[in-house]
């Protein structure tokens, strides 16, 4: 039977889809790229925002219609939506629901669904997913590697601890076995993933940590670049900063969500730091790694956010000068502390206005930061082509650079001279191909 996956949300969901696709492929299923080619559709869902939840519900409705017309046979739901909604998704037309920590059992669940059973399987079987688990990688040169599942932080706005569970790290030897396997298969870039990736190893209580993992993963000659995300500010250690600074294979890039620049709002969010501590962390990273790229996330319109709170956020963005900034308006998530106890009292129009002002500020900062690239030669790893047929890739600071060429290969290292900047990607001219 043929299976189509539609994936929503974060990189961990992408990695989970790769895992489920690999397991099903090993069990004789054919993974296809188009839903019209499939007998089975699996939606790997995200509920971090209301909009993402609405998207997969809309898709579920469309696929239910296709099933009634006989064009598909089964519909499955995976990801965070499974843990949040469970049986309700069966009532909405799904044939099976599998939890985010249950994906190692996807073949067994699908077999039961194929026999006509309506299945909701939400058990914590995440230990069954390890270096031996087959994965269908969607990139030839880059691989996602989930090293820690779940989150213990319980920020008041966030649904993740309720849908992904508590933190559970993979043993370091098992992660390194996966890295070794990838290196042998020609992968040259890896990204270590976790909702709170810097907490990696704490629960193992054997000294394992992210810094030591990066150091050991870099010993594989084929691996040329190592990324990690997402970071929680107070879990970034001096040792991690030193490792990123000194290890030539470690990408000089940190993604550190700040969420607000107001100390009052940070306390309401249960973020365990204040604005000064965050800015001191940014300064520390840049003092050790002068050209480090630091990106962040911000939520605008959190309950009770005043104009003063918002201006504090604007001020923090001016001082931090992020390379990139992911912005979102606050939306209550079912089951979180904020949805239970805080009234969503900032008008939608005000939220959007605040977001747009922050977006304009960040664009201005981006243009200013990007000016330093003009005329410089940088090395990137080619990732693919744009819709316009141009090639693109990233440098070691996570800067996207677009260029034209007669022919280069995905995963190839090339040197580019930057001749055009924007508030987003840079543009360059090919100077030299450095090979695969």
UniProtKB/Swiss-Prot annotation:
[4Fe-4S] cluster 1 binds at residues 10, 46, 80. Residues 137-368 form the Radical SAM core domain. Its cofactor is [4Fe-4S] cluster. One of its GO terms (molecular function) is N6-isopentenyladenosine methylthiotransferase activity. This is tRNA-2-methylthio-N(6)-dimethylallyladenosine synthase. It is found in: Cytoplasm. Residues 371-432 form the TRAM domain. InterPro entries: Elp3/MiaA/NifB-like_rSAM, Methylthiotransferase, Methylthiotransferase_CS, Methylthiotransferase_N, Methylthiotransferase_N_sf, MiaB_methiolase, rSAM, rSAM_horseshoe. GO terms for cellular component: cytosol. Pfam families: Radical_SAM, TRAM, UPF0004. It comes from Pseudothermotoga lettingae (strain ATCC BAA-301 / DSM 14385 / NBRC 107922 / TMO) (Thermotoga lettingae). NCBIfam families: miaB-methiolase (TIGR01574), MiaB/RimO family radical SAM methylthiotransferase (TIGR00089). Catalyzes the methylthiolation of N6-(dimethylallyl)adenosine (i(6)A), leading to the formation of 2-methylthio-N6-(dimethylallyl)adenosine (ms(2)i(6)A) at position 37 in tRNAs that read codons beginning with uridine.
